[in-house]
């Protein structure tokens, strides 16, 4: 996908007065257009390595020290891409933008308005941009912590507005133990979904596993996630199709490696 985007942009440059090296086009594309999620840590690390290698081969040093590689931790994520709730509770919604929410918690009225949310989102965006380009380890850790804190603050605001602060305390305890059983696309990649948008293209090779296998473990995990295609006797690839379509912007393109059984 990276090479295809760079090829298209290179062809378009001839109609403009702008000029970019292949390395610059790749770096811009990685920073602004490529995102990924996988349940397996090793798969994510391999994807990072492939992008780094693709950058290295086109970096012209001209006898100078090579430029530091970008930090991809917040572009390529480890997580369960099909689960975005906790205890069947929605943890974040882009509907926050442009609205005001009011919640009664412990007999106190808490008002979270768009100014508060937008300020957090702005800090989150700025921290991600800085994190992508920094090579200082201390600064990297500082920014990573800030991003996690800002995301948790948005989750807290959502749950408090729902009157479910007790749920937040349980999530906080899990995060401290390095456990996170959900992946919130609209929050992790908020810049993609702002203003009701989504991905232009979603590419995947979904697994083919019957939900009733392993004693119905997958069925139990997904039954309350709100998928219209869910049936206990179904296959997880159907859920992936629904999720992929849901992540697309209007007129977006879904590109999956799939069986031809449904065409027979």
Give the label of every model feature segment.
Residues 1-20, 84-132, 146, 150-264:
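SAM-dependent methyltransferase catalytic-core segment centered on the flexible catalytic loop
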């Amino acid at each position: 996908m990276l090479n295809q985007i760079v090829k298209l942009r290179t062809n378009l440059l001839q109609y403009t007065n702008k000029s970019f090296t292949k390395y610059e086009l790749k770096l811009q594309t990685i920073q602004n257009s490529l995102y990924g999620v996988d349940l397996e840590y090793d798969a994510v690390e391999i994807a990072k390595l492939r992008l780094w290698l693709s950058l290295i081969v086109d970096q012209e040093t001209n006898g100078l020290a090579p430029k530091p590689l970008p930090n991809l931790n917040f572009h390529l994520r480890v997580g369960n891409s099909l689960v975005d709730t906790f205890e069947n509770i929605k943890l974040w919604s882009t509907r926050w933008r442009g609205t005001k929410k009011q919640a009664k918690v412990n007999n106190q009225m808490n008002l979270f308005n768009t100014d508060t949310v937008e300020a957090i989102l702005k800090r989150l965006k700025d921290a991600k941009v800085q994190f992508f380009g920094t090579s200082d380890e201390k600064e990297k850790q500082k920014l990573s912590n800030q991003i996690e804190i800002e995301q948790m603050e948005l989750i807290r605001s959502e749950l408090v507005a729902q009157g479910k602060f007790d749920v937040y305390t349980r999530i906080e305890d899990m995060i401290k133990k390095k456990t996170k059983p959900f992946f919130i696309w609209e929050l992790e990649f908020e810049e993609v979904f702002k203003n009701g948008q989504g991905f232009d293209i979603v590419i995947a090779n979904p697994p083919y596993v019957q939900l009733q296998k392993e004693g119905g473990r997958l069925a139990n995990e997904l039954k309350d996630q709100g998928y219209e295609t869910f049936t206990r006797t179904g296959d997880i690839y159907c859920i992936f199709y629904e999720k992929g379509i849901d992540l697309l912007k209007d007129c977006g393109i879904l590109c999956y490696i799939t069986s031809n059984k449904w065409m027979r």
